[in-house]
């Protein structure tokens, strides 16, 4: 059951959230089926960025790295029964830059949109979840039930992290 009052986002929050998503898009978390081609350092930077941008979530969520890139946060609720999970992935497919009208990892704002890999699939979802949880934690919120945040860095290559998180 969802209840509560919806708040209108103020312009400062909108700018902050846009900036945070832009920072995520700029990190080249490109997955390759040949794992040796994947730049692991970009994935490490992405995870550090999450800790830096969302310190309350990082602390309350007892973040765990599962497998190479899987992230699992558990935010204890008033009850461990009937837990809720939000999921997203933060890896992207390779981008042939010559086929783009702009740098696919620029994260630039253009005509009110954030441009680049992950801005729609699905760093935007991950950013939205983290922003919402961070805001609620800032308000002193304790979820009614345990809340899990599950993020994979291998979705684009059908990696094992999501399965490992479930287990």
Predicted regions and their residues:
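Acidic/His- and Gly-rich active-site-bordering loop/insert found
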Residues: 1-122, 126, 136-144
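Acidic/histidine-rich catalytic neighborhood of metal-dependent amide-processing enzymes
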Residues: 120-167
């Amino acid at each position: 059951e969802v209840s509560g009052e919806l708040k209108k986002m103020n312009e400062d929050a909108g700018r902050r959230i846009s900036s945070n998503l832009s920072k995520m898009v700029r990190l080249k978390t490109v997955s390759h089926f040949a794992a040796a081609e994947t730049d692991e350092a970009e994935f490490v930077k992405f995870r550090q960025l999450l800790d830096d941008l969302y310190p309350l979530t990082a602390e309350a969520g007892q973040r765990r790295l599962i497998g190479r890139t899987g992230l699992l946060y558990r935010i204890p609720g008033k009850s461990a029964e009937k837990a809720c999970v939000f999921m997203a992935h933060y890896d992207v497919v390779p981008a042939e830059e010559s086929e783009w009208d702009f740098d696919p990892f620029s994260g630039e704002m253009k005509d009110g949109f954030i441009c680049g890999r992950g801005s729609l699939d699905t760093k935007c979802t991950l950013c939205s979840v983290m922003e919402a949880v961070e805001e609620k934690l800032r308000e002193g919120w304790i979820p009614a039930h345990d809340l899990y945040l599950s993020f994979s860095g291998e979705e684009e290559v059908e990696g094992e992290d999501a399965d490992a998180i479930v287990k």
